[in-house]
Regions:
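Gly/Ser/Thr-enriched, mixed-charge loops and adjacent short helices
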Residues: 112-162
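Surface-exposed loop/turn and secondary-structure junction residues enriched for glycine/proline
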Residues: 11-21, 29, 81-84, 89, ...
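Ferredoxin-reductase
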Residues: 39, 44-121
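An N-terminal, well-structured beta->alpha segment
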Residues: 1-64, 70-71, 146-162
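Generic alpha-helix signal with a bias toward terminal, lower-confidence helices
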Residues: 20-24, 59, 90, 98, ...
Length: 162
């Protein structure tokens, strides 16, 4: 892809048009490159990833995870969860960061996005702009991470109830 949709890198997340057929601004190719860029920028070796129910979320999540694992990051795949569940996973699981594939309050099914954490803190502001530069520059490290199925919603709900 010659031109990437840099306008999707916002102040607190990455958001844009994403259709279930793989078209739009946020494509599976974008998600793969984002996974590669996140691995390089954050330097994490273990990451939690969750997604919402939007039509585009399965493909975006699969390619994000592939980008992370191709860079040597092991991924705890949380499955379909809420954003709060991903944040909880970052606090309670042995991970160094997390990503939620969601466009939050933006319209379904035309939008999607990525909310990212380093450790327990959401990426924001200058960090997202630095990530954008890594995304654009390329030069990603190769590695071999694994995907671990790790449903976390029950643990999250139990923590809320307790």
């Amino acid at each position: 892809m010659g031109e990437w949709p840099v306008q999707c890198f916002k102040a607190y997340d990455i958001r844009g048009l994403a259709n279930g057929d793989g078209s739009g601004e946020l494509t599976p190719q974008f998600a793969y490159r984002l996974g590669r860029a996140m691995a390089k920028y954050l330097g994490c070796k273990r990451f939690a990833v969750g997604r919402d129910i939007r039509d585009s979320s399965p493909a975006l999540t699969a390619e994000l995870i592939r980008g992370l694992t191709d860079s040597g990051v092991s991924v705890l795949d949380l499955g379909i969860v809420s954003t709060g569940c991903v944040y909880h996973a970052c606090w309670t699981l042995p991970v160094e960061g997390g990503v939620m594939v969601t466009a939050s309050h933006l319209p379904m099914p035309t939008h999607n996005g990525f909310k990212m954490c380093r450790g327990t803190l959401p990426l924001a502001g200058e960090e997202i702009q630095e990530l954008k530069q890594v995304f654009l520059d390329g030069n990603f490290a190769d590695g071999s991470g694994e995907v671990i199925d790790n449903p976390h919603m029950d643990n999250y709900l139990k923590a809320i109830i307790d």
